[in-house]
From Swiss-Prot:
This is Ribonuclease HI. Its EC number is 3.1.26.4. One of its GO terms (cellular component) is cytoplasm. The keyword Disulfide bond does not apply. It comes from Xylella fastidiosa (strain Temecula1 / ATCC 700964). Its cofactor is Mg(2+). GO terms for biological process: DNA replication, removal of RNA primer. Mg(2+) 1 binds at residues 9, 47, 69. InterPro entries: RNase_H, RNaseH-like_sf, RNaseH_domain, RNaseH_sf, RNaseHI. The gene is rnhA. Binds 1 Mg(2+) ion per subunit. May bind a second metal ion at a regulatory site, or after substrate binding. It is an enzyme of class 3 (hydrolase). Endonuclease that specifically degrades the RNA of RNA-DNA hybrids.
Amino acid sequence: MKLINAYTDGSCLGNPGPGGWAVLLRYKNNEKELVGGELDTTNNRMELMAAIMALERLSEPCQIKLHTDSQYVRQGITEWMSGWVRRGWKTAAGDPVKNRDLWERLCAATQRHMIEWCWVKAHNGDSDNERVDVLARGQAMAQRSTVASR
């Protein structure tokens, strides 16, 4: 099973507003960057999209170290998800889970991989985290430019 390092980040200008996500996939000496964005979104949706795209892009089952600066993503998938599912996609307070569509997609994307979810402190000198931060912010700015030119 291939060992992949994945670095993910999401960015949103305004929250809600234009947003972007970015992924850096690394296998041995090979790297692949993935980016995308949406016109009207939130930072949490972009963080989720980055993780989803990292996992969905891999064509075979892999062992993955997924690095994210989002506690929302890391805690959601490792701590909260099982309770949400058990409660019919309700939080402990009984409210509907926000971003359920993306959480379900992320859950499905995890099924064929062995994943270690690693939290990285944002803006703290991790060069790969900084790299995806710049890419995600660039995608958010590109989305904002698209809105401004309409």
